[in-house]
Every structure is written in structure tokens, then in C-alpha cells.
């Protein structure tokens, strides 16, 4: 890596500290999955009745394989950095915690299994949040690149058919993805109307 590349990475981390911490957490989660399988219970989802509220969130950091980690990290860097630079690190963290908890709870109650993980539910939440914020208040966020929303919703619907699981044995947390998207849309609508308006709105 050249000096200019190192400088660019350093500047990116400084500009997006929360995104960087979330990606670091995902890397650590992926390593723990690799070295601790079967996964220790404290990393997995636990319902509210257990009183261990942190475990409502911890599954978002668990990733199963390099592709799973890389795919989610790229999307998180792209979508999360947009929100963090526009509204700050705390705002992004609150979105991640709220939507992560919702998507994890829905996935657990839908599947009945606590053996799931990944940042994908949060990714769909951030996608929905950015999309609806731009639609309702265009001055607050730039539009998503052409075709991204269509591609991601199409991928969600394709995964829900069960083809991947039947053909490749890849289990997909469809309930987490769908509930993440919906929660992001809902929060996007809420913040579009309660946030400070710009003169160009």
C-alpha cells in the first residue's frame, strides 16, 4: 500500500469513526465465529426475558465467511458514511441499534432459532432510511445511485423464494432483511418531519 493510499484510509477512518468501529466490530465478530464454532451462547440473540439486553444487538456483528463480511462492510461503508457525515456519529449509532434490535427480534420470532447473524438487516434499514429521506426532503440527502434500491429489493425478494437455500444450502435471514428495511423506512419518515428543515426544502 502506497503512502497516498494509507493517507486516504486514515482520512476515511477519521471522517467516519462510527462506521469504522462498526466494521471493526464485524471483523472481530467474524473472527470469533471462525475460532469459536459452535458459537458461545453469549454472542447469540437472547430475548428481553433473559434480561441481557446487549444480546439484542450482538448478532449484527457475527459474520459467516469472508464474502458475508466483505459484502456487508462495503454496504455499511457506503450507506453508513453518508448518514454519519450528514447527521453525525450518534445519529448513525441510534439507527443501527434501533434497527438492529428490531431486525434481530423479528428474525428470532419468525424462525425460532437464535443461530443467525450479520449486518444485513441494518444495511436494509440504512438503505430504506436514505431512500425515503431523499424522497420526502430532497435537500437533506442526495439520491441513492441509480438502480440500488431496485437491486436490493429484488435481491430481497429473490432470497425469500428459498432458491439459495435449496440450491446452495445458504440460509438467509429474510425476516431480518425485510423488517430492517421497514424499520428504516419508518424512521426515515419520522426524521424527515421532525428534523430541522433547510431553506431549500
Regions found by a protein language model. Give the residues of each.
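A detector for small-residue-rich transmembrane helices and their helix-helix packing motifs
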Residues: 2-201
Amino acid at each position: 500500500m502506497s503512502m497516498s493510499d494509507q493517507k486516504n484510509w486514515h482520512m476515511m477512518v477519521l471522517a467516519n469513526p462510527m462506521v469504522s468501529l462498526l466494521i471493526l466490530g464485524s471483523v472481530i465478530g467474524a473472527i470469533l465465529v471462525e475460532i469459536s464454532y459452535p458459537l458461545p451462547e453469549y454472542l447469540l440473540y437472547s430475548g428481553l426475558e433473559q434480561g441481557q439486553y446487549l444480546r439484542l444487538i450482538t448478532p449484527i456483528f457475527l459474520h459467516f465467511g469472508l464474502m458475508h463480511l466483505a459484502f456487508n462492510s462495503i454496504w455499511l461503508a457506503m450507506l453508513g458514511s453518508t448518514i454519519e457525515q450528514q447527521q453525525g456519529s450518534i445519529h448513525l449509532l441510534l439507527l443501527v441499534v434501533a434497527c438492529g434490535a428490531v431486525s434481530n427480534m423479528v428474525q428470532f420470532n419468525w424462525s425460532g432459532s437464535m443461530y443467525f447473524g450479520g449486518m444485513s438487516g441494518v444495511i436494509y434499514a440504512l438503505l430504506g432510511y436514505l431512500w425515503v429521506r431523499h424522497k420526502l426532503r430532497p435537500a437533506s440527502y442526495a439520491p441513492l445511485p441509480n438502480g440500488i434500491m431496485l437491486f436490493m429489493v429484488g435481491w430481497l425478494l429473490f432470497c425469500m423464494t428459498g432458491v439459495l437455500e435449496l440450491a446452495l444450502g445458504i440460509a438467509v435471514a429474510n425476516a431480518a432483511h425485510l423488517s430492517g428495511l421497514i424499520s428504516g423506512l419508518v424512521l426515515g419518515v419520522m426524521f424527515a418531519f421532525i428534523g430541522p428543515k433547510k431553506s431549500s426544502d
